[in-house]
Design a protein with these regions (language model features):
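Bacterial N-terminal signal peptides that target proteins for export
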Residues: 1-7
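Bacterial N-terminal signal peptides
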Residues: 8-14
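Boundary of Sec targeting at the N-terminus
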Residues: 20-23
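Residue-level signal for mature regions of secreted extracellular proteins and peptides
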Residues: 28, 33, 43, 72, ...
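Low-complexity intrinsically disordered segments
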Residues: 81-139
Length: 139
């Protein structure tokens, strides 16, 4: 009978130990992916460890570009470090406006001007302001 009375206590001890072990201070879920995305999109290289967070970030898509950019900014703001100071808030804003839109292929497509009179296509060399902010961010 005493063994049956101790069973709930043993089970409770096991589950509390498991819960304490799971709370090791590491982020999980979208918070983890958001923090990883901030790090990956802030660096000049994209290692393979960035794939899940970048996939999640770039999978955010809405009908209007402004809605997509706002949703991506909101996703990055899930990371607690994203709002630690004004420079980080500006970095998140610059990332959400520039990431995926400032590579060579995107710029060539968006900055191409076609002259229908002479059938000549010209790519402007003026960098958009969102790319300048993204590339020149203090972080």
């Amino acid at each position: 009978m005493k063994k049956l009375a101790l069973l709930p206590l043993a089970l409770a001890g096991m589950f509390s130990a498991t819960a304490a072990q799971a709370d090791d201070g590491l982020f999980t879920g979208d918070v983890r992916l958001a923090c990883e995305a901030v790090l990956c999109l802030s660096s000049g290289t994209r290692p393979s460890e960035c794939a899940p967070s970048l996939k999640r970030y770039f999978s955010i898509s809405h009908k209007k570009l402004s809605d997509t950019l706002k949703a991506r900014r909101n996703f990055l703001n899930l990371c607690p470090a994203a709002s630690q100071d004004e420079k980080m808030r500006q970095l998140v804003n610059d990332i959400s406006n520039g990431a995926g839109r400032c590579d060579a292929a995107s710029l060539n497509a968006s900055l191409m001007v076609w002259n229908w009179d002479s059938d000549v296509r010209i790519v402007s060399n003026a960098m958009p302001s969102y790319c300048t902010a993204y590339n020149d961010n203090a972080y």
